[in-house]
Each structure stands twice: as structure tokens, then as C-alpha cells.
């Protein structure tokens, strides 16, 4: 059996002389994980949003605020001003109007669900573009949370999801 005692005594180590900070020089002054902080300018990013049965794949690139939704402008795709405002809310909260161009592909669902999916996709893309600066405001406004409400299924023996047929006592 091998001996467990070392042949030479261990050297005394002065613990006070060591620090937890690295001695490697850091390039640049930013401490952010995000690319925008590293370069100081808007960066392209992508996000996926879902709402009801709608799915929106969103890509944002630095630009002048142009929207392309399934190859059409925002005003053509969402003629209702309420839906246009809903989709623009993440930019308004971050005060980034006309700083990014948005390219989106939306499929499934209706108009309202598609607008909600697009808003979530835009918010996630903005979050990815600059996590440190954008995440707090987007999270506080509730734009990073998926709205998981969906249509309740119809149950057997009922006319709709909850509506029962008329009850007759006699």
C-alpha cells in the first residue's frame, strides 16, 4: 500500500496576497455581454413572437424605421391604427423610434393575434440587440412576457366551451 504522507512538507501560502480579480488586461471599457455596448451603435438582432395561433419571426437591423411585414408596409398589413400602435410600443418605451428597420414574417392566427406576436418578436429582438440597456424597460412594461391565453376547447355535451344547452325542469 502506498504512503499518503508527502516526502517534502508543503510550503506556507500567504492567502492575503491573492485576489479574486484577474490580472489580464481587458480590451475596451464596456462590461456588457451585448454587442451594442461593445460597438456603441445599434446591432442587428432577431426574435420570435407567438400569440394565440400566430407566429412572427422578426429581424431588426439599424436603419430609418421602415417596416416590412410579409413583404408589405406596416400600414398596408395592419390598416387599424390600434394594431400599428401595439406593434410600435417596444420602440416607444425604449425611445428608439426610427433607429431600426423591421423585417417580419407572420403566419397563422388573426389580425389581433398577429399584432401581439409581432410586438413580442420585436421586443425580444430589441432585448437581444442590447440586453443591458433594454431589458429592464421592456420587462417592466411587460413586453417580454408571452401572453399564453388561447381559445378554450369545446367540451362534449355543451354547445360551446362553457355554454350549456337550455335546461328544462319539466
Curated annotation (Swiss-Prot):
Keywords: Ribonucleoprotein, Ribosomal protein. Signal peptide: none annotated. Residues 1-47 are annotated as: Disordered. GO terms for molecular function: RNA binding; structural constituent of ribosome. One of its GO terms (biological process) is translation. InterPro entries: Ribosomal_Su5_D2-typ_SF (IPR020568), Ribosomal_uS9 (IPR000754), Ribosomal_uS9_bac/plastid (IPR023035), Ribosomal_uS9_CS (IPR020574), Ribsml_uS5_D2-typ_fold_subgr (IPR014721). Pfam families: Ribosomal_S9. GO terms for cellular component: cytoplasm; small ribosomal subunit. Belongs to the universal ribosomal protein uS9 family. This is Small ribosomal subunit protein uS9. It comes from Streptomyces coelicolor (strain ATCC BAA-471 / A3(2) / M145).
Amino acid at each position: 500500500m502506498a504512503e499518503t504522507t508527502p516526502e517534502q512538507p508543503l510550503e506556507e501560502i500567504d492567502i492575503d496576497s491573492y485576489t479574486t480579480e484577474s490580472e489580464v488586461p481587458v480590451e475596451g471599457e464596456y462590461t456588457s455581454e451585448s454587442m451594442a455596448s461593445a460597438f456603441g451603435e445599434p446591432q442587428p438582432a432577431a426574435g420570435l413572437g407567438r400569440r394565440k395561433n400566430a407566429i412572427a419571426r422578426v429581424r431588426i437591423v439599424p436603419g430609418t424605421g421602415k417596416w416590412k411585414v410579409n413583404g408589405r408596409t406596416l400600414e398596408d398589413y395592419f390598416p387599424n391604427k390600434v394594431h400599428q400602435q401595439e406593434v410600435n410600443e417596444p420602440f416607444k418605451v425604449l425611445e428608439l423610434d426610427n433607429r431600426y428597420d423591421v423585417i417580419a414574417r407572420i403566419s397563422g392566427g388573426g389580425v389581433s393575434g398577429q399584432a401581439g406576436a409581432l410586438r413580442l418578436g420585436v421586443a425580444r429582438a430589441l432585448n437581444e440587440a442590447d440586453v443591458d440597456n433594454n431589458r429592464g424597460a421592456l420587462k417592466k412594461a411587460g413586453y417580454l412576457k408571452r401572453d399564453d391565453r388561447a381559445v378554450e376547447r369545446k367540451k362534449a355535451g355543451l354547445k360551446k366551451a362553457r355554454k350549456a344547452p337550455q335546461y328544462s325542469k319539466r
